Amino acid sequence: MHPLAEYPRPAMRRDSCEILNGPWQYAITQTAEYPAAWQGSILVPYSPEAPASGVNRTLQPGQWLHYHRLFAPPAGEGGRVLLHFGAVDYACAVQVNGHLAGGHRGGYWPFTLDITDLLNGTGRNSLWVAVQDPTGHGTQARGKQTLKPGGMFYPAQSGIWQTVWLERVPDNYIQTLTVTPDYDARTVTVRVHTAKPGGAVNLWAMVRAGGVTIAEDWGSDEADQDGEVTLNIPEEHFFPWSPDTPFLYDLTVGTNQGEKAGLDTVHSYFALRKWSCAPDAHGVLRFCLNDKPILLNGLLDQGYWPEGLYTPPSDAAVERELSEVKALGFNLLRKHAKIEPQRWYYHCDRLGLIVWQDIVNGGSAYNLWFVTYLTNALQPLLRRFPDGKACRRLLSRAKPAGREEYAHELADTVQALRCHPCIACWVPFNEGWGQFDAGKAVEAIRELDDTRMVDEASGWFDQGGGDVHSLHNYFYPLRIRPQKRTVALSEYGGIAWPMPGHEPPHKTYGYGTAKDRQELTARYKKLQLKTVLPQLEKGLSALVYTQLTDVEDEVNGLFTYDRAAVKPDANAVRSVNAALAAEFARVTNPAKK
């Protein structure tokens, strides 16, 4: 049985899939050369630093992590064989049967290699992957990873940490699928790019709702390798997506080219929903879903697991955690400093959990005394600190190559995740970590995706752009004032309590510590009902409490790190969320005086 054996890419599915997760050979060496001897077994897709890998070793900058296994191609004849990696942190080279198949840089994004011409006819093929990861010694995106964990920064992880899989496809297969729903027009536009030149692509698409075909059409011929078709959704089958009704349409897409029919077929899904920022009935700017004001009420989600670090123990564990978040009355998760496997977003799409997605932070080593400690203490004075050329060294972005790399990372993130209806907002920068030219980052995001909101600079170093006036507040009295952008409290709370039986083995970290469950519950209720709730009438429209779970030393989660228990009283949390929703409905009601 493979770990994480579910189909890894729900938004672009084919029938052919061979999962390569499981035991591989590994070695950690000082060179890129093929290892003289293998040092043991590693359970892919868990990083060697993760207990679940069976290795429990930390890859150091300058070292090489080598993987090896034998494999057979997927069943079938002809076509092409693709090798997919969900994510490898950070830089890797891949060889098949002793020949270079390709490589990749970037620890959070999927990549695909066509290995057809490197396969032998015996059914026993050799796969070797060599990885390096500089962690904090480079400028690449790394999130909360550090080689010296503690407090708000967590253990580094490296190598293969998402599913590896094979797929047999036709010669001229669909390389990319872009699905763009239009809520106002009640349409969905499907665009494909195919692998092989040689004539215009004929594209066919079919939409089903509840098992019934509701739209089907052929697209007009497009330029070489491209095809596009727009389908109209009948009014009687118009089912808007929301947290209460997360309806997903099934989509099937097929292509042919010239006289050849049925070259490739993929299955996907989409939702009809619309995000905007607009005044409510009283002229106060609000986040709107499907043209109606909505209170975004959620949790900061770091995406760490005790046994797998970045990698969850199972797909069922992910689904269970997200379902429990909804059961507590939350409708939002801010995915913080990490990108998840595609199935995480699929479950959010299906369950109706809204996501604010961070662009993973990078840059050279941070001046934490400035961007975190001093700024937190003097936030009102430093909130509008500039992020232009003169300040790049202070904000860890002095290196041109690092800034160029960030531009690619931003584009890769939006392109990889834009298919997921759950995502409502992109967050290019958090608390000044590697921040630079935030206004240009907003422009770059809008060019790639103009259907979602942008929180230009979460916390501080606000340059006045994007859609969100974004506040982090752990220490100051909360006073919301009218703004020209919609107001979000994008981090707050963080009340710590190391729950007996679940506490970390080392020191604990948080923002004020409760002595027991009763005190934690009382402090949580007081913060939400006495401090936060009155600010809804003044324009507060989104809440992100810190945080979903305990993480390593940081014990300020609503859930324990192992997800075994809710730390405050669960009924009290549900009651608080119901009160917040009721107050938001009251203050946005046109009949309110």
What are these regions (language model features)?
Residues 6, 10-11, 25-30, 57-174, ...:
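Accessory beta-strand-rich segments of carbohydrate-active enzymes
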Residues 168-198, 281-286, 579-592:
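Surface beta-strand/loop "capping" patches
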Residues 94-96, 186-221, 229:
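Beta-strand-rich binding/interaction modules
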Residues 332-577, 583-589:
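Substrate-binding/catalytic cleft of secreted carbohydrate-active enzymes
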Residues 113-118, 230-246, 529:
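Signal that preferentially marks extracellular ectodomain short beta-strand elements
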Residues 1-53, 130, 134-139, 160, ...:
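Accessory carbohydrate-binding/adhesion or oligomerization-edge regions at the termini
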Residues 126-129, 245-256:
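Short, aromatic- and glycine-rich surface loops/edge beta-strands on solvent-exposed regions
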Residues 177-178, 252-325, 579, 583-586:
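N-terminal carbohydrate-binding accessory modules
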